[in-house]
Amino acid sequence: MSFAGLNDADVAAALAACTAADSFNHKAFFAKVGLASKSSDDVKKAFYVIDQDKSGFIEEDELKLFLQNFSASARALTDAETKAFLADGDKDGDGMIGVDEFAAMIKG
């Protein structure tokens, strides 16, 4: 797993809780995997793992594959889940989530 410091059992439980389509809630997921209690540096490391193209932003296509960063066999997010995730994180309205927006979303 590419997220050092997260408990594998917590990650597995968080993934199991959102296997059904439209059951993903990013706030609940962040809390279950333990990201919400991590340091700012750890949150930034998580951001850079999710930012697959290394653009400095998490775009909609990267959000769709969010769960697969935690487990290759996890499902893709639905369009509705992806749009809700993006809408909550994208505070400046540029259609992407920057590292500070991501940190605020996890800690919020």
UniProtKB/Swiss-Prot annotation:
It holds the Pfam family EF-hand_7. Transmembrane segments: none annotated. The modification N-acetylserine is found at S2. The keyword Protein transport does not apply. It comes from the Eukaryota. One of its GO terms (molecular function) is calcium ion binding. Ca(2+) 1 binds at D51, D53, S55, F57, E59, E62. The keyword Metal-binding applies. PROSITE patterns: EF_HAND_1 (PS00018), EF_HAND_2 (PS50222). Residues 38-73, 77-108 form the EF-hand domain. Ca(2+) 2 binds at D90, D92, D94, M96, E101. GO terms for cellular component: axon; axon terminus; cytoplasm; dendrite. Signal peptide: none annotated. Keywords: Acetylation, Allergen, Calcium, Metal-binding, Muscle protein, Repeat. Belongs to the parvalbumin family. In muscle, parvalbumin is thought to be involved in relaxation after contraction. It binds two calcium ions. This is Parvalbumin beta 2. It comes from Salmo salar (Atlantic salmon).
